[in-house]
Amino acid sequence: MTDLTPREIVSELDRFIIGQKEAKRAVAVALRNRWRRKQLADDLRDEVYPKNILMIGPTGVGKTEISRRLARLAKAPFLKVEATKFTEVGYVGRDVDSIIRDLVDAAIVETRARMREDVKARAAKAAEDRVIEAVAGRDAREQTREMFRGKLKRGELDNTVIEIDVADTSNPMQMLDPTGQGQMGMMNLGEIFGKAFGGRTQRRKMTVAESHDILMNEEADKLLDDEVVKATALEAVQQNGIVFIDEIDKVCARSDMRGADVSREGVQRDLLPLIEGTTVSTKYGPVKTDHILFIASGAFHIAKPSDLLPELQGRLPIRVELRALTEEDFVRILSETDNALTLQYKALMQTEKVGITFTEDGIAALASIAAEVNRSVENIGARRLYTVMERVFEELSFQAPDRSGEEVTVDAAYVEKNLGELARSSDLSRYVL
């Protein structure tokens, strides 16, 4: 669980997302409240429930990006899902309880990886011994083993091919799992038979370098107690779990529509107990959802937040509106963020030994065209920059291998030459940009 302050969380999000101060502050406070709750006495801690968040804003303004960055900051079990993937209980498809099962699966993987780090030194020694045994033979004298150990540490054996017995992770009964409907709260058929066939090994040929990670993981897993991993992961999910539900507006049953709709209102009704607090059966044991934080987001182009079931609205008490991005925002996105598209294209072209320099007026021209096309065609926010940049670099990307050693300056004239006519013709930009 992260102990970053709200100011530090917002500062970290600012590196990748421009604007949207209110949304950043809301998720930062929600994340900090998880830490605050952990400091309380046990009896009071159980009474403090998370304040779930509803983020409302047009497409391409940073809703999903906030969730992706939050996942890395949280250091807690985190899952992002799309509401449109689920159907009402009783129909073919995934029901909403699988959200919690997926969250638990993610937590198990995360917990195991963290615990492997704790036993890394012991696992490395055991893995080293197995490699030396494969190279020198089981009956080798201590002096010979030490000689090979020295070579191994110096990397002299990296390309040596060895034969070792590794755990056979293939599951011959995998075909018995119904597609898309595995683990309905219990261990599925594939896993039952998988355990019956468990403990098998297969002899594989690989280089010493390739064997390193495989043997490290195997030896680390031998040192871990599966029950402790499971219990730790379940506790982390119940106390610190965060679920981000995207496209929540797509499951709104609009007031002007008639007739039954399997994946809309039914999904909302199924989400109610999950968000309010219920117990979900998973193959690792029951999970209580009372203290899991839910963040829902949607563009609400056609539906309105008021089209959500009133009970669901009540369970998402914190409302945050994200504003549409302007031309100035696009300039900042291209020049200030740590993962700016300009940096990405520079790095990509550098692999072909082509140097790229972006001038201020070049970046301004790119931002201006993106904003103009958003206004005249359809506002898809910052995603428009991907399309604009790809069109500007289309010719250069194709010719780059033949232009090795060249320096290219992307200024206003370069952008105009590659994109000007296209941007000015609204008919063309409708289909191309």
Swiss-Prot record:
<dbReference type="GO" id="GO:0008233">
    <property type="term" value="F:peptidase activity"/>
</dbReference>
<dbReference type="GO" id="GO:0005524">
    <property type="term" value="F:ATP binding"/>
</dbReference>
<dbReference type="GO" id="GO:0036402">
    <property type="term" value="F:proteasome-activating activity"/>
</dbReference>
<dbReference type="InterPro" id="IPR003959">
    <property type="entry name" value="ATPase_AAA_core"/>
</dbReference>
<keyword id="KW-0143">Chaperone</keyword>
<keyword id="KW-0067">ATP-binding</keyword>
<dbReference type="InterPro" id="IPR050052">
    <property type="entry name" value="ATP-dep_Clp_protease_ClpX"/>
</dbReference>
<feature type="binding site">
    <location>
        <position position="311"/>
    </location>
    <ligand>
        <name>ATP</name>
    </ligand>
</feature>
<dbReference type="GO" id="GO:0016887">
    <property type="term" value="F:ATP hydrolysis activity"/>
</dbReference>
<keyword id="KW-0346">Stress response</keyword>
<dbReference type="InterPro" id="IPR019489">
    <property type="entry name" value="Clp_ATPase_C"/>
</dbReference>
<feature type="binding site">
    <location>
        <begin position="60"/>
        <end position="65"/>
    </location>
    <ligand>
        <name>ATP</name>
    </ligand>
</feature>
<dbReference type="Pfam" id="PF07724">
    <property type="entry name" value="AAA_2"/>
</dbReference>
<protein>
    <recommendedName>
        <fullName>ATP-dependent protease ATPase subunit HslU</fullName>
    </recommendedName>
</protein>
<feature type="binding site">
    <location>
        <position position="383"/>
    </location>
    <ligand>
        <name>ATP</name>
    </ligand>
</feature>
<dbReference type="Pfam" id="PF00004">
    <property type="entry name" value="AAA"/>
</dbReference>
<dbReference type="InterPro" id="IPR003593">
    <property type="entry name" value="AAA+_ATPase"/>
</dbReference>
<comment type="subunit">
    <text>A double ring-shaped homohexamer of HslV is capped on each side by a ring-shaped HslU homohexamer. The assembly of the HslU/HslV complex is dependent on binding of ATP.</text>
</comment>
<dbReference type="InterPro" id="IPR027417">
    <property type="entry name" value="P-loop_NTPase"/>
</dbReference>
<comment type="function">
    <text>ATPase subunit of a proteasome-like degradation complex; this subunit has chaperone activity. The binding of ATP and its subsequent hydrolysis by HslU are essential for unfolding of protein substrates subsequently hydrolyzed by HslV. HslU recognizes the N-terminal part of its protein substrates and unfolds these before they are guided to HslV for hydrolysis.</text>
</comment>
<dbReference type="GO" id="GO:0051603">
    <property type="term" value="P:proteolysis involved in protein catabolic process"/>
</dbReference>
<keyword id="KW-0963">Cytoplasm</keyword>
<comment type="similarity">
    <text>Belongs to the ClpX chaperone family. HslU subfamily.</text>
</comment>
<feature type="binding site">
    <location>
        <position position="246"/>
    </location>
    <ligand>
        <name>ATP</name>
    </ligand>
</feature>
<dbReference type="InterPro" id="IPR004491">
    <property type="entry name" value="HslU"/>
</dbReference>
<dbReference type="GO" id="GO:0043335">
    <property type="term" value="P:protein unfolding"/>
</dbReference>
<keyword id="KW-0547">Nucleotide-binding</keyword>
<feature type="binding site">
    <location>
        <position position="18"/>
    </location>
    <ligand>
        <name>ATP</name>
    </ligand>
</feature>
<dbReference type="GO" id="GO:0009376">
    <property type="term" value="C:HslUV protease complex"/>
</dbReference>
